[in-house]
């Protein structure tokens, strides 16, 4: 008599097949493989794909090759304006600290003589996170919330933060040159920079900017008509907003990929920063004697 055939799936040699294990977790058996590379993957490593499952490494490699969406100004498209929220939080923290330690305003507010003669350069930026009262805080905070939400989405996180910092520094720079003996606090320089930038970028997008223009004119009127307001910080910030906003919105001319656009924006923002540094360091020697301040 002949021998019956072996059961289906059994080895003729009597050996049991070696079970496959996940390539990332050697202690986990699996019967599923990545449909892209063929490596075995356990349930924790399975990423659902249009056909079957992919492993984490193939998914990561695919994400690196996908072009990220960008705005018309070259910034990455964002979901949340995290920089705006962070700045609002820092401004709020600064105000709370002022209530606990009132001497903070004198120690960290903008004072041109203290900056240039005393070497307290940190005042150029720390002054932007301090305020003269609750209404001052609420106005600047509300303006930052509205303008920041729009600008950060248009420009992206990096460009928006650059605009804010250069606006604050420009307001402090003009205060140092024209009113070095005056102590000033507030984010108004940076806020006026946002006004200038939102006008330029909004026009570039073809939006109706008449309401922004009206608000800007009203605030400029308040700047010069209401006493004890640092017009130097407002004007310095506004100039920065128009200049930096124009860099981001109008340059480079013509069509450009995001790498070339980013390079141009970085170089132009760096050039503006260098100009600002020259004014801060060398400006007082020329301006203060002309104004009779020394």
Regions inferred by a protein language model and the residue ranges of each:
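N-terminal TM1-TM2 helical hairpin plus the immediately adjacent luminal interfacial "cap"
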Residues: 73, 79-187, 227-229
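Membrane-embedded alpha-helical segments of multi-pass transporters/permeases
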Residues: 173-177, 206, 242, 246
């Amino acid at each position: 008599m002949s021998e019956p055939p072996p059961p289906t799936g059994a080895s003729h040699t009597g050996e049991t097949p070696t079970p496959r294990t996940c390539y990332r977790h050697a202690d986990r058996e699996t019967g599923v493989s990545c449909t892209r590379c063929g490596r075995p993957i356990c349930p924790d490593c399975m990423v659902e794909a249009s056909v079957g499952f992919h492993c984490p490494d193939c998914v990561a490699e695919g994400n690196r090759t996908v072009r990220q969406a960008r705005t018309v100004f070259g910034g990455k498209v964002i979901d949340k304006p995290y920089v705006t929220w962070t700045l609002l939080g820092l401004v709020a923290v600064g105000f709370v600290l002022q209530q606990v330690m009132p001497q903070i305003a004198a120690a960290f507010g903008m004072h041109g003589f203290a900056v240039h003669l005393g070497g307290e350069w940190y005042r150029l930026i720390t002054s932007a996170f301090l305020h003269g009262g609750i209404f001052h805080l609420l106005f600047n905070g509300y303006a930052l919330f509205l303008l920041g939400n729009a600008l950060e989405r248009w420009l992206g996180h990096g460009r928006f933060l650059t605009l804010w910092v250069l606006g604050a520094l420009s307001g402090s720079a003009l205060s140092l040159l024209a009113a070095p003996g005056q102590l000033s606090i507030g984010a108004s320089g940076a806020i006026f920079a946002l006004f200038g930038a939102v006008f330029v970028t909004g026009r570039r997008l073809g939006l109706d900017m008449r309401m922004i223009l009206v608000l800007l004119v009203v605030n400029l009127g308040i700047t010069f008509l209401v006493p004890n307001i640092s017009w130097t910080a407002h004007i310095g910030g506004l100039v920065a907003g128009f200049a930096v906003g124009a860099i981001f919105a109008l340059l480079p001319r013509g069509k450009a990929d995001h790498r070339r656009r980013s390079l141009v924006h970085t170089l132009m923002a760096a050039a503006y920063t260098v100009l600002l540094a020259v004014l801060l360091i060398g400006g007082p020697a020329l301006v203060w004697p002309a104004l009779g301040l020394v």
